[in-house]
Amino acid sequence: MKRNINLFKCGGDKMYVVVVYDISLDEKGSRNWRKIFGICKRYLHHIQNSVFEGELSEVDIQRLKYEVSKYIRDDLDSFIIFKSRNERWMEKEMLGLQEDKTDNFL
């Protein structure tokens, strides 16, 4: 009997992704900005300054996050991933500095 066992899901359903990042441009930040830009360009389409979009599988999103996390400084930089399987809903995920401009209530 032949079994077809898929131990690793390579790909899966794709979802629409928007990536937005803000890197502090001190001496190390300039280098990090270039590295992050290059990583994002490999996975997504560049649409504006530090904004990218495209369709990625969950596996590719995890790879992107892993690669970028090497250059994000938690106290200075932010990297935001908006994900949606449906056009009406987006999931917001943040790495690094998490300053939410809409959260100003005491």
From Swiss-Prot:
The keyword Hydrolase applies. Its EC number is 3.1.-.-. Keywords: Antiviral defense, Endonuclease, Hydrolase, Magnesium, Metal-binding, Nuclease. GO terms for biological process: defense response to virus; maintenance of CRISPR repeat elements. InterPro entries: CRISPR_associated_Cas2, Virulence_VapD/CRISPR_Cas2. Mg(2+) binds at residue 22. It is an enzyme of class 3 (hydrolase). Its cofactor is Mg(2+). GO terms for molecular function: metal ion binding; RNA endonuclease activity. It holds the Pfam family CRISPR_Cas2. The keyword Transferase does not apply. Homodimer, forms a heterotetramer with a Cas1 homodimer. Belongs to the CRISPR-associated endoribonuclease Cas2 protein family. CRISPR (clustered regularly interspaced short palindromic repeat), is an adaptive immune system that provides protection against mobile genetic elements (viruses, transposable elements and conjugative plasmids). CRISPR clusters contain sequences complementary to antecedent mobile elements and target invading nucleic acids. CRISPR clusters are transcribed and processed into CRISPR RNA (crRNA). Functions as a ssRNA-specific endoribonuclease. Involved in the integration of spacer DNA into the CRISPR cassette. This is CRISPR-associated endoribonuclease Cas2. It comes from Fusobacterium nucleatum subsp. nucleatum (strain ATCC 25586 / DSM 15643 / BCRC 10681 / CIP 101130 / JCM 8532 / KCTC 2640 / LMG 13131 / VPI 4355). The gene is cas2.
